[in-house]
């Protein structure tokens, strides 16, 4: 039940997605189904690493990730979820390649990377079709919604067949 998330992140309003949201003003209780550890993301304004160059900033955040995995968790972390660009968290854009550097650490530890593309997917970054493409990676799982439905309640999740088939359910739909 251990998850890594990014400080200042927003992942939704359901009980589980509020649990991994990295903003205290969205949390109404501490009784959540996950044990979440928050790591530094692309937010620079009040970050202790904000004064660094892009490469140094990325390296400092990756070092923080390594440290939190080692000392801030029990070690059996399921995944890290991140928005390629934080929307509700202040429209925060990390340096290109940022999540690629983080994914290298996650892969070494056997931790899945989930890209929350609800706000950035379907060409909404203006540069790429998916926000994660700016980081030179393919996430293990990615979620998408707003750009797909154009106002209608549509969403999706994409992962490898191995991951999707590991869920012994008839459906994962919420609609």
Positions of predicted regions on the chain:
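Conserved N-terminal phosphate-binding loop of PLP-dependent enzymes in the Aspartate aminotransferase
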Residues: 1-175
């Amino acid at each position: 039940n251990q998850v890594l998330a990014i400080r200042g992140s927003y992942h939704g309003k359901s009980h589980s997605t509020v649990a991994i949201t990295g903003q205290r003003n969205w949390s109404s209780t501490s009784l959540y189904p996950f044990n979440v550890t928050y790591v530094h993301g692309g937010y620079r304004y009040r970050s202790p690493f904000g004064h660094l160059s892009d490469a140094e900033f990325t390296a400092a955040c990756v070092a923080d990730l390594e440290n939190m995995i080692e000392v801030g968790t029990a070690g059996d972390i399921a995944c890290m979820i991140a928005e390629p660009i934080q929307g509700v968290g202040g429209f925060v854009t990390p340096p290109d390649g940022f999540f690629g550097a983080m994914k290298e650490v996650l892969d070494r530890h056997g931790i899945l990377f989930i890209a929350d593309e609800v706000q950035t997917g379907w060409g909404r970054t203006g540069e790429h079709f998916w926000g994660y493409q700016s980081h030179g990676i393919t996430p293990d799982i990615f979620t998408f919604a707003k750009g797909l439905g154009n106002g209608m309640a549509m969403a999706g999740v994409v992962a490898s067949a191995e991951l999707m088939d590991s869920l012994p359910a008839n459906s994962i739909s919420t609609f």
